[in-house]
Amino acid sequence: MKINGNEIRPGNVLMHQDTLWVAVKTDHVKPGKGGAFAQVELKNLLDGRKLNERFRAADKVEKVRLEQKDYTFLFASDDMLTFMDAETYEQIELQTDFVGEERASYLTDGMTVVVESHEERPIGISLPQHVTLEVADTEPVVKGQTAANSYKPAILSNGVRSSVPPFVGVGEKIIVATEDGSYVKRAD
């Protein structure tokens, strides 16, 4: 679907220069002299490159709609991750680099993820916002340490390092944000 250059919004996926780009940031500029334009920061969906582009209101840009499908994570072997389509039971394999080394460490057997694809080709993956993990190692609580925002380092069951409150001990299950590995709360 073609849209005008001034209709580009952050999050839009565009076909520009024969490549898929996502609009990260848009600034609409109305100079005193000349026509209005949109200054758009684009990120390449395939290799992560960034590009700043200027679109006039009259410019036409191809807006792409990505297919989003639920997949279940099955297992990891070497540098490949195997997922199964929840509806057709068809399996796909993606390289760990495609997902990202740190993000791949949050994947657990049976976890549901959303795979975004364009023309049957996977181009992105969305993990759940939060996952439940066990604290594998952390420092013991120091009595009398009552600072309001004191966190201590911890290593989680998936090997990721995080900061947890002083009351969290080894073996406890906590909920962690997959975006940055930060502590959210204790698991029930």
Curated annotation (Swiss-Prot):
Pathway(s) the chain acts in: Protein biosynthesis; polypeptide chain elongation
Function: Involved in peptide bond synthesis. Stimulates efficient translation and peptide-bond synthesis on native or reconstituted 70S ribosomes in vitro. Probably functions indirectly by altering the affinity of the ribosome for aminoacyl-tRNA, thus increasing their reactivity as acceptors for peptidyl transferase.
UniProt name for this protein: Elongation factor P
Gene from which this protein is expressed: efp
InterPro entries the UniProt entry points to: Elong-fact-P_C, NA-bd_OB-fold, Rib_uL2_dom2, Transl_elong_fac_P/YeiP, Transl_elong_KOW-like, Transl_elong_P/YeiP_cen, Transl_elongation_fac_P, Translation_prot_SH3-like_sf
Disulfides per UniProt: none
Subcellular location: Cytoplasm
Annotated GO CC locations: cytoplasm
Keyword set includes rRNA-binding: no
A molecular function GO annotation: translation elongation factor activity
GO annotation, biological process: peptide biosynthetic process
